[in-house]
Regions:
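Conserved hydrophobic/aromatic beta-strand scaffold that supports enzyme active sites
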Residues: 3, 23, 44, 53, ...
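Unchanged
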Residues: 72-159, 163, 167-168, 178, ...
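Small, basic N-terminal interaction modules of short regulatory proteins
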Residues: 2-6, 92, 179
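Conserved Nudix-box catalytic region and its N-terminal flanking loop in Nudix hydrolases
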Residues: 46-88
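Short connector loops at helix/strand junctions that flank enzyme active sites
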Residues: 21, 38-40, 46, 60-62, ...
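A short linear hydrophobic-aromatic micro-motif
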Residues: 13, 53, 99-103
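Short, highly charged C-terminal tails/helix-capping segments
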Residues: 173-180
Length: 196
């Protein structure tokens, strides 16, 4: 990359403030160009019957609640990325079982794949990162359902609380389709039957 896609100024390579990776940056309009795989990975961290959610301090969906998740970095596995994002966004140390993949969402309209892994919270004493305004542990009845940031997060939470009484957490894979009115529908394309 040589020029900014937004203002056509020359790009420079540097490590942006608050980052630890070399990025293409535009010093004219302050745009940072992230060259990441289009895989979003995160966890569904639990402590007892409560789920850890993060209130977003950044766009998109500023002020809305989400599971800790973000883009994978080059050179890391999906599980390693999910664990990293959970520590960065929620300040939580977690334990993840080897068969912990829980939901996978294909979003062909935006060329992204979202993966969420079930995780047990080991330590919640760390400070959340700059992308998170606050964190909270919520039982099902306490979740701010109308303030959930993304449909894939809502779907993951709904399935988790549906599965929790049976202690069976099958892996579910979905195709997500965007309608002309910006509505989103999911279609289950795979459903495993593992007991944990």
């Amino acid at each position: 990359m040589k020029y900014c896609h937004h203002c056509a100024s020359p790009l420079v390579q540097r490590v942006p403030e608050g980052d630890d990776k070399l990025r293409y940056c535009c010093d004219s309009c302050d745009t940072i160009f992230y060259q990441n795989p289009k895989n979003v990975v995160g966890t569904l961290p639990v402590q007892g019957d409560r789920v850890l959610l993060c209130k977003r301090a950044i766009q998109p969906r500023l002020g809305k609640w989400t599971l800790p998740a973000g883009f994978m970095e080059n050179g890391e596995s999906s599980l390693d990325g999910a664990i990293r994002e959970t520590l960065e966004e929620a300040g939580a140390l977690i334990k993840v079982q080897k068969d912990s993949l829980y939901t996978l969402f294909n979003l062909p309209a935006i060329n992204q794949v979202y993966m969420f892994f079930r995780a047990e919270i080991i330590n919640l004493d760390a400070t959340p990162g700059f992308e998170t305004e606050e964190i909270g542990l919520f039982a099902e009845s306490e979740i701010p359902w109308d303030e959930i940031a993304f449909p894939v997060v809502r779907s993951t939470l709904e399935h988790y609380f549906q599965d929790l009484p049976r202690k069976r957490f099958p892996v579910r894979m979905f195709d997500v389709h965007h309608g002309e009115d910006r509505s989103i529908t999911t279609h289950v394309i795979s459903h495993s039957h593992h007991e944990y």
